[in-house]
Amino acid sequence: MLKLTDITWLYHHLPMRFSLTVERGEQVAILGPSGAGKSTLLNLIAGFLTPASGSLTIDSVDHTTTPPSRRPVSMLFQENNLFSHLTVAQNIGLGLNPGLKLNAAQQEKMHAIARQMGIDNLMARLPGELSGGQRQRVALARCLVREQPILLLDEPFSALDPALRQEMLTLVSTSCQQQKMTLLMVSHSVEDAARIATRSVVVADGRIAWQGKTDELLSGKASASALLGITG
């Protein structure tokens, strides 16, 4: 479904190079030390960075140089990127039509996603009137309403308290299963990864150092466990 073949990004003339295959509907965690290249990997998939070499295909279609706006990918960051002067409904609606001219079917889709996120009673509010968790629900709704086959998460819930973070992770996992979306999530927490991703990828020094079952990492038996400070 998603295939990266020697995708290379030159960082201060030091190449970061990734090869990775992810199947449709998989939920994969991307782990590793700070500065290892996790966010770079996601930005290459999303199209925010243009690789120096290599190829990237989605459903066997070459998207190596496709601009972000035309790539079949949605991405959610720690900074939710909501527009402060637009209502919740308008922020979500941007995912359907940048001009916010929604037809009846699009209006219904927007409200259905809002109900799924538990924010249907907040549609007339501005982002500044919401809690941090509510703002991330709005940002997630905007991603989901686009119905792209791939969802990328770059630690969007790291600023939330532990209980709320787990609630959001469960919501993401369930939503991806319902929409049959492929999920790649950058995280610093193996415990968070284990909640929604049976498979993990460990990035170190701009390379994929290990990939396999998340449970193996948690047990401390995987070769990459030590990179994450886990001992058996």
Curated annotation (Swiss-Prot):
Would the keyword Transmembrane turn up in this protein's UniProt record?
no
Give EC number(s), comma-separated. 7.6.2.15
Cross-referenced InterPro entries, in alphabetical order? Answer: AAA+_ATPase, ABC_SmlMolc_Importer, ABC_transporter-like_ATP-bd, ABC_transporter-like_CS, P-loop_NTPase, Thiamine_ABC_ThiQ
> Which compartment or compartments is the protein found in?
Cell inner membrane
Q: What are the binding positions for ATP in this chain?
A: G32, P33, S34, G35, A36, G37, K38, S39
Q: SMART domains given for it?
A: AAA
Q: Which terms are listed as keywords in the entry?
A: ATP-binding, Cell inner membrane, Cell membrane, Membrane, Nucleotide-binding, Translocase, Transport
Q: Which GO terms describe its cellular component?
A: plasma membrane
**Domain (ABC transporter) ranges:** 2-230
Bilayer topology term? Peripheral membrane protein
GO MF, one example = ATP hydrolysis activity
> In which broad location class does this protein mainly occur, judging by the first location in its UniProt entry?
membrane
Q: Name the Pfam families on file.
A: ABC_tran
Q: How does it assemble?
A: The complex is composed of two ATP-binding proteins (ThiQ), two transmembrane proteins (ThiP) and a solute-binding protein (ThiB).
Q: In UniProt terms, what function does this protein have?
A: Part of the ABC transporter complex ThiBPQ involved in thiamine import. Responsible for energy coupling to the transport system.
Q: What family does the database annotate?
A: Belongs to the ABC transporter superfamily. Thiamine importer (TC 3.A.1.19.1) family.
Q: What protein name applies here?
A: Thiamine import ATP-binding protein ThiQ
Q: Which organism is it from?
A: Shigella sonnei (strain Ss046)
Gene encoding it? thiQ
